[in-house]
């Protein structure tokens, strides 16, 4: 009987150790520190809300720039601006709230700011990354990936991801377009702001001039 108990005990210890090793080996993603939203309208049609999580631990300056532009707390920002460039199976681009054509925009730090780091890669759909016109030319323009885009690694700073509303991103990438990949009807951010963080959202990441060109 004693040997049988020892056998069962050994079995449970092996199982527990195996589970611990699996959990320890799971890849841990960047921590989400802030959550912002865009309410989107296409022409006269309301598409709904996109909720975005920001990686404020990994890229704090870039995440703070986007957060403040989403709230408009500096007196300028994303509300009322359009997604001016949309390419199916690649990305949707917005954030030019000064000119609206991909040649404008500005950051909360001035016209442009440096590439903070390239620790994060473009490994999945729904990632939020900075559009730019070359090295250290970040302003306010951004894009959301609709494909895995490894050729952008080391050139564009990834700083967040879509938490809710990727179906809306998918609708945007499929709208009719004209010249320069611009939607024929405006795809507008009619309202934007910051949402209260919840504990599960905060830990989600741990579980898992010239045109700005990509």
UniProtKB/Swiss-Prot annotation:
Q: Which UniProt keywords apply?
A: Endoplasmic reticulum, Glycoprotein, Isomerase, Rotamase, Signal
Motif Prevents secretion from ER located where?
211-214
Q: Which EC number(s) are documented for this chain?
A: 5.2.1.8
Listed SUPFAM superfamilies: Cyclophilin-like
Activity modulation: Inhibited by cyclosporin A (CsA).
Major enzyme class: isomerase
Question: What CDD domains does the database record attribute to this sequence?
Answer: cyclophilin_ABH_like
Location of the protein in the cell: Endoplasmic reticulum lumen
A Gene Ontology cellular component where this protein is annotated is: endoplasmic reticulum
**Which molecular function GO terms apply here?**
cyclosporin A binding; peptidyl-prolyl cis-trans isomerase activity
Q: Report the protein's function.
A: PPIases accelerate the folding of proteins. It catalyzes the cis-trans isomerization of proline imidic peptide bonds in oligopeptides.
By sequence similarity, the record places it as follows:
Belongs to the cyclophilin-type PPIase family. PPIase B subfamily.
Q: What is this protein called?
A: Peptidyl-prolyl cis-trans isomerase B
The scientific name of the source species is Emericella nidulans (strain FGSC A4 / ATCC 38163 / CBS 112.46 / NRRL 194 / M139) (Aspergillus nidulans)
The record's gene field reads: cpr2
């Amino acid at each position: 009987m004693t040997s049988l108990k020892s056998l069962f005990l050994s079995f449970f210890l092996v199982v527990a150790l195996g589970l611990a090793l699996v959990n320890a080996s799971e890849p841990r993603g960047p921590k989400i520190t802030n959550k912002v939203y865009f309410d989107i309208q296409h022409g006269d049609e309301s598409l709904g809300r996109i909720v975005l999580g920001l990686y404020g631990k990994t890229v704090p300056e870039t995440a703070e720039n986007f957060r403040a532009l989403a709230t408009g707390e500096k007196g300028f920002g994303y509300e009322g601006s359009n997604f001016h460039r949309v390419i199916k199976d690649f990305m949707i681009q917005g954030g030019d709230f000064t000119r609206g054509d991909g040649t404008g925009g500005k950051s909360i730090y001035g016209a442009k700011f440096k590439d903070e780091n390239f620790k994060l890669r473009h490994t999945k759909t729904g990632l939020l990354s900075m559009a730019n016109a070359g090295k250290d030319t970040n302003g306010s323009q951004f894009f959301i990936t609709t494909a895995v885009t490894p050729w952008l690694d080391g050139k564009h700073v990834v700083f967040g991801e879509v938490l809710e509303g990727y179906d809306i991103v998918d609708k945007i990438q499929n709208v009719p377009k004209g010249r320069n990949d611009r939607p024929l009807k405006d795809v507008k951010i009619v309202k934007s702001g910051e949402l209260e963080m919840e504990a599960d959202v905060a830990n989600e990441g741990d579980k898992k001039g010239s045109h700005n060109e990509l």
